[in-house]
Amino acid sequence: MAYAIIEASDKQLWVEPGRFYDLDRLDADLDQSLTLDKVLLVQDEGAPQIGQPYVAGATVQVTVLSHPRGRKVTVYKMTPKKKTRKKQGHRQDLTRVLVESITVGGKVLTANAADLPKSEADIDAAG
């Protein structure tokens, strides 16, 4: 099983080819292909390649699937014995990306064809 740990949207993610992930909103169009080059670790067969801080020559190719909004988070602030109450909600803007491949040292790591989703409906049913 090939995987990589990347840094995207100021967060670290464990990504595998053929899977989709929700990142903080990226400025990209739908079906646009992006290359993420902040790869901290790559694991294929054998020992993992660990970067200091990034693995040289390693990239992750992703495709933008959609721009959803996250679940609502309710913030409720109250002062006891006073009539001070404040209720706020927040929904984070997200970008759903599909990891197409991981490239390290000229070697391209992709998912098996059986593991990839067949359609957009399969992606929505899985997540």
UniProtKB/Swiss-Prot annotation:
The keyword Metal-binding does not apply. Keywords: Ribonucleoprotein, Ribosomal protein, RNA-binding, rRNA-binding. The keyword Ribonucleoprotein applies. One of its GO terms (molecular function) is rRNA binding. Transmembrane segments: none annotated. It comes from the Bacteria. GO terms for biological process: translation. InterPro entries: bL21-like, bL21-like_sf, Ribosomal_bL21, Ribosomal_bL21_CS. GO terms for cellular component: cytoplasm; ribonucleoprotein complex; ribosome. Disulfide bonds: none annotated. Belongs to the bacterial ribosomal protein bL21 family. This protein binds to 23S rRNA in the presence of protein L20. Part of the 50S ribosomal subunit. Contacts protein L20. PANTHER family: 50S RIBOSOMAL PROTEIN L21 (PTHR21349), LARGE RIBOSOMAL SUBUNIT PROTEIN BL21M (PTHR21349:SF0). This is Large ribosomal subunit protein bL21.
